[in-house]
């Protein structure tokens, strides 16, 4: 969670740091952590390899959605077009291949708030990216997620919906989409 604030501070106060070490850090992040095409996974410096084997696609999806929403969206909103925006867009487009279908997430996360957190983060991201790009595919994807919660599912009848802590991301996401 500290990463975007280091980059934003350097962007505002130290262009040499921003264009030097922090840009290098972005390139190293991509080089070391990309595990499923461009999607990142947790890298262990002591092992000089990924932290977990075998691959846990649920963790990869969760981490990528977190990185986009908490790490890259704040940078994009202040800086605009940059290598960080390019990273955000490639991650988002790659995620679409893995989480466009809701049953996919359920196979990784049983009875946890992770599905709501991921979908909420995606709604927040997709709404903002739609405004940034004007590309209808991002709005359509967001609407599909929202329809799942507001039309396809009777939330009063489901066995488990956790809206506290991280699961509440869905509320913010639905709100942002409503304004979009």
List the predicted regions and their residue ranges.
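Glycan-recognition and catalytic cores of secretory/periplasmic carbohydrate-active enzymes
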Residues: 1-180
């Amino acid at each position: 969670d500290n990463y975007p604030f280091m980059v934003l501070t350097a962007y505002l106060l130290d262009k040499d740091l921003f264009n030097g070490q922090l840009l290098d850090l972005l390139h190293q992040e991509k080089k070391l952590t990309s595990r499923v095409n461009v999607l990142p996974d947790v890298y262990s410096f002591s092992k000089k390899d990924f932290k977990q084997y075998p691959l846990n696609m649920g963790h990869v999806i969760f981490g990528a959605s977190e990185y986009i929403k908490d790490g890259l969206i704040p940078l994009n909103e202040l800086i605009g077009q940059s290598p960080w925006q390019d990273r955000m867009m490639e991650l988002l487009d790659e995620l679409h291949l893995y989480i466009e279908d809701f049953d996919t997430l359920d196979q990784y996360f049983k009875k946890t708030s992770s599905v709501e957190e991921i979908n909420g983060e995606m709604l927040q991201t997709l709404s903002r990216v739609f405004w940034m790009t004007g590309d209808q595919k991002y709005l359509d994807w967001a609407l599909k997620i929202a329809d799942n919660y507001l039309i396809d599912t009777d939330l009063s009848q489901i066995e488990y919906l956790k809206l506290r802590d991280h699961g509440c991301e869905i509320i913010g996401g639905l709100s942002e989409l409503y304004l979009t």
